Amino acid sequence: MIQYLQVGKIVNTHGIKGEVKAIPLTDNPRRFNKLKWAYVSKEISNEMPKFDIVSVKHHKNFVILKFSGIDDMNAAEKLKEHFVIIDRKDAVKLPKDTFFICDLIGMNVFDTEEKKLGVLTDVLSTGSNDVYVVKSDNNKEILIPALKSVVKKVCFEDNKMVVDLPQGLIDDEV
C-alpha cells in the first residue's frame, strides 16, 4: 500500500500573510483541522519538505492553510501546484469495508466465476454511492457500483477485487 496520501492541492495564495488556498482531495475537508503538520511537494518522494500547520480555515470548497515559515505572498506563491501530503499512519481511520481510493486504483477486478473484467482505473463519487471505473483488456469501460451487494471481496495482498455483477450490467464482449 502507498505510504503517503495526497489530501489537498494548493491552487493559489490567499491574502498577503503567506496563506495558501487548497482544494481538498478528501471526502471530509474538516479532517484538515486535526493536522499538525504536512509535507508539501509536487510529487511524493523521500525528500519532501515538512511544514507545521499554524492555522486551518474553510472557505467555500477550499481549505485555507497557513504553514510555519511561509510568511508572505511571495513565499506562498512558490507552493502553488504543490500537494499537501500526509503519512498514512496519520490518516483518519476508515470504517470497515471502506478504502482509500489510491489503494484501489490498479487493482485487478474479477467476477465471481474468476473471469477477469479488467483493471480499476478510477472511482467516481455520485452522491448515493461510489462507482468503480474498470477498463477491460479491449479498452471498454465498465462502471461498477461500489455496493456491498456487488463487491464481494477486496484483497490487497493479491491486488484483486471480486464482484458479483447485476444481470445486464455488461455485455458478453468484455
Swiss-Prot record:
What keywords appear on the UniProt entry?
Answer: Chaperone, Cytoplasm, Ribosome biogenesis, rRNA processing
Source species, domain of life: Bacteria
SUBUNIT field: Binds ribosomal protein uS19.
Q: Which gene encodes it?
A: rimM
Free-text note on domains in this protein's UniProt record: The PRC barrel domain binds ribosomal protein uS19.
The record's section on HAMAP family has: Ribosome_mat_RimM
UniProt KW Transcription keyword: no
General function of this protein: An accessory protein needed during the final step in the assembly of 30S ribosomal subunit, possibly for assembly of the head region. Essential for efficient processing of 16S rRNA. May be needed both before and after RbfA during the maturation of 16S rRNA. It has affinity for free ribosomal 30S subunits but not for 70S ribosomes.
User: Which InterPro entries is this protein grouped with?
Assistant: PRC_barrel-like_sf, PRC_RimM, RimM, RimM_N, RimM_N_sf, Transl_B-barrel_sf
Any one GO BP annotation for this protein: rRNA processing
Residue ranges of every copy of the PRC barrel domain listed in the record:
96-169
Instruction: Identify its protein family.
Output: Belongs to the RimM family.
Cellular component GO terms, alphabetical:
cytoplasm; ribosome
Taxonomy of origin reads: Bacteria, Bacillati, Bacillota, Clostridia, Eubacteriales
Provide the protein name.
Answer: Ribosome maturation factor RimM
For this protein, the record's PANTHER family field holds: RIBOSOME MATURATION FACTOR RIMM
Cellular compartment(s): Cytoplasm
Q: Which organism is it from?
A: Acetivibrio thermocellus (strain ATCC 27405 / DSM 1237 / JCM 9322 / NBRC 103400 / NCIMB 10682 / NRRL B-4536 / VPI 7372) (Clostridium thermocellum)
For whether the record's keyword set contains Zinc, the answer is no
The protein's matches in Pfam families, at most eight in alphabetical order, are given as:
PRC_RimM, RimM
One term of GO molecular function: ribosome binding
